[in-house]
Amino acid sequence: MPVMDIQQIWDILPHRYPMLLVDRIEELEEERVVGIKNVTINEPFFTGHFPDIPVMPGVMIIEAMAQVAGILVLSSIPDRKNKLVLLAAVNEAKFRRPVVPGDQLRIEMKVIKRKSTIAKMNGVATVNGLVVAEAEMMCKLADRTDRV
């Protein structure tokens, strides 16, 4: 049973179709989260990437990782309706295997360091236990009313 279903994810993240890239949260701890993205042929990016050989763009995998990280950060904040988590940096991104329609992307994000409005995390995305991508990222907590 998921820790968060899509309804609960909608309550935390501002993203909606076609940019919402998290279907459920399976594990949620203070410094760690595991999210799932079910990759289907209906994803809009498959129309052009690539028409005859659909492969999920690496940048979309990074975005899915950032959204899972955002859920970790926002889940512990009481006034989260007034907050956004912005991606501030991506380092050491590596793409090991292609992600294709039918894959279930399992994303694990762990906090390395956290300050008042900044969180640095390591992330690993897997399909069937095989690493498909990994990255270190930094997220910034901001007010929704701030100009970004």
Language model: regions and residue ranges:
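HotDog/MaoC-like acyl-thioester-processing domains
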Residues: 32, 100-103, 110-148
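Hydrophobic beta-strand-centered segment that forms part of the acyl-chain substrate-binding groove
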Residues: 1-3, 69-106, 132-134, 139-140
